[in-house]
C-alpha cells in the first residue's frame, strides 16, 4: 500500500498542487486525470522519488515503484538491452547485489548480512538471473522478437522506439508501475497489447492519460488532480466518473445558488426591518407630553423591530457558505476561414519512399480537397511520420518515386508529434507572436488564456519548461489564427487534456479546409468526421 498524505509542491514560487491525499492498494488500476499544467507528471515523479514534495509524505510498505518512460530521447545512445535493464530496475538490483556480495566476503557481520539479504531479495524479485529470457519474451510480446537487443536506440524509427518502450513495461517487475501518457504514438495493436497487460497484471498501475478509449478499458478508479487543493476521488470506471462528476458539479452549483438565494432573502428582510425600525423611531415627538404613552409604545415597537433586524443579520452572518464550483475554462476555438477555394490542396500520386534500400512507404496515392479529412493509418514503424515530413519537405529520403503536387498559394500548417515550439528559451506569448506575427499583444494574450494557459505562465515561463500539453495548446492557438487551407497533424492529441481534445474535435468538425491526420486516438478519430482512410 502506498499512502499519500498532504502532499504539496511548489515551483518558482507557484503552488502547483496542495494537500493531495489518496491511497494506492495492491492491484489497483488508477487513471490520473486533470488539465494540462495541473502537475500530474510532477506527482508521478514525487511518488517515484525523483523529486521531493514541498510538504507532505509518501508512506509505503516497501513496495518497489517504477516509472516507465514513453519518450526515449534520454537513452538514444544506449542499446535496447541496456535501456530496458535500466528502466526496469534490473541494473540497479544487479549492481547492488554484486556490491553486497563483495562486501560480505570482506566484512561478514550481522549488519552486512542483513543488507546482503535485502539486496538478495530485490535481486530475486526482479528476476535478475533470468533477465535475458525476460527481455526476449517482452520484445516478442511487443512484436519485436526479431530485433537485436544489442542495437542502439538511435538506429530505430520513432515507431519502433515506441514499441521498445512498450516492451520495457512488459519486462518490469515493479509492485507499482507509473505510466505517463503510455498510448502517445502507440498504434492500435500496441494499445490493445498494453490494455491486456494492465488488466491481467498483479501489479498496481497509476496511469496519466487523456486517451478516453484507453482509460475506459483499463482504469477501475479515477483520481482527478485539478491543480489546486486536494484531489477528487471516484471509485468508478471512466464513463461512470464522467457522469458522477457532472452530477456532483451540478449538485454543488445548485447548493451554492440556494445559498445565494437565501442570503439575498435574509439581507432584504434585515434591510426592511431596519427601515421600519428607523421610521417608527422618527415618528414620535418627545415634546408633546400628551402623547407620552403613545411615544413609549412606538419606541418599544421600534426597539422590537430593530432587535428582529439584528437577529436576521446574525443569521445572515452564521449562514454557512458552501464550496463554490470553480468555473472550468471552456476552450472553444475555430480555424479561420480558408483563403483557398482550389479544387486540390495537395495531390500524392504513387509515392514510394525508402531508406537504406529498404522500402518503408508506398506506393501511396491520395488527393486532398477543401472539406476532406484524410486519416493516415499504419503500425508503429510503418513510416507515417516520415510520409508527412517528406510532404512538408522536412526530410530527403535515400530514394523516392512518385509525385507530390501542392495547390498554388495554398497555406499549409503542420504540427509534428513532438509538438516542439520554435523559441525554446522564450515564453508562450513570444512563441505565439512569432508563429502569428500579425497578432496584437492583447489579442495574443487573450487567445492563450482562452486555450487554458495560466496567466503567469503565458509571459514568464520558458517554452522548454512547459508541459507537452501546454506546448500543444500554443501550437493550436497559432494554427487557429493563420487561416490554413490545409492542416497536417501528426498525433495531435498527444499530451492534450480532454477538454482541449474535445474542443479540437469540434473545431475540426466545422473546418472547411483540408486535413491530413495521423492518430491512434479512437474517440478522436470517431468524432472528427474522417472522409477517407489511407493504410500504409
Language-model features, listed with the residues they occupy:
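Proline-centered turn/helix-capping motifs that create local helix->coil transitions or kinks
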Residues: 278-283, 318-328
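Short amphipathic alpha-helical coiled-coil/interface segments
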Residues: 112-123, 295, 309-319
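Non-transmembrane amphipathic alpha-helical segments
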Residues: 93-104, 119, 259, 263-277, ...
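ABC ATP-binding cassette signature C-motif
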Residues: 1-256, 336-536
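Short coil/turn segments at secondary-structure boundaries
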Residues: 98, 283-286, 327-331, 445, ...
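Short, flexible cytosolic linker that couples an ABC transmembrane/permease module to its adjacent nucleotide-binding
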Residues: 325-340
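ABC ATPase nucleotide-binding domains
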Residues: 250-292, 298-305
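Alpha-helix-centered segments that form part of catalytic cores
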Residues: 124-125, 129-135, 301-313, 317
